[in-house]
């Protein structure tokens, strides 16, 4: 907004359906005319009377222009706020004329005698960034990556580590038991190669004299009967 602009707010009815056009650069612009008619109450006749109508052309640019073309139509009562501009032009006959137009900042329906269903349209510059590859999309991808990474590292890794610990501890313990068993076998081997234990009392060889006391070969080969 430049210094010295004449700000204006107009309430009126749309005379004709808005026209949507596009500039060579691709910018959308919508034009429509409104009639703002003052009304006053005549106490003598006890009726409302219409004054002289003010006709103004309204120009709307970019995304708002597309929304206006899709939402508004002839006869609707609207509220327009913007800057009052004077535009001069020359007719085909060479006559110079001037018109007053409103460069609209905001356009909306008047809800005094009507209802409106407002639907928000996604903004082209931010919708792709937010949902496609911007903040929301990137944040969502990052969260999924963290969740998957954390799940893989924590659960899978921890589960594998536990299995590894169980296998090592169990196998190691089992191996230790085997080693202990082998140690017992060694003891048995020692038992086999060590001094003989005492024979039972009912052993027939128990009453034989010790070896080397006499008999054939210096030892008793047969028990006495």
From Swiss-Prot:
Database matches in Pfam families: SSB
Low complexity bias: start-end ranges: 164-188
Residue ranges constituting the SSB domain according to the UniProt record: 3-111
Region Disordered, annotated ranges: 111-225
Biased composition (Gly residues): 125-148
Recorded GO CC terms: nucleoid
GO molecular function: single-stranded DNA binding
GO biological process: DNA replication
UniProt key word Ion transport: no
Keyword annotations from UniProtKB, A to Z: DNA-binding
Subunit structure: Homotetramer.
Protein's UniProt name: Single-stranded DNA-binding protein
The species this protein was found in: Corynebacterium glutamicum (strain ATCC 13032 / DSM 20300 / JCM 1318 / BCRC 11384 / CCUG 27702 / LMG 3730 / NBRC 12168 / NCIMB 10025 / NRRL B-2784 / 534)
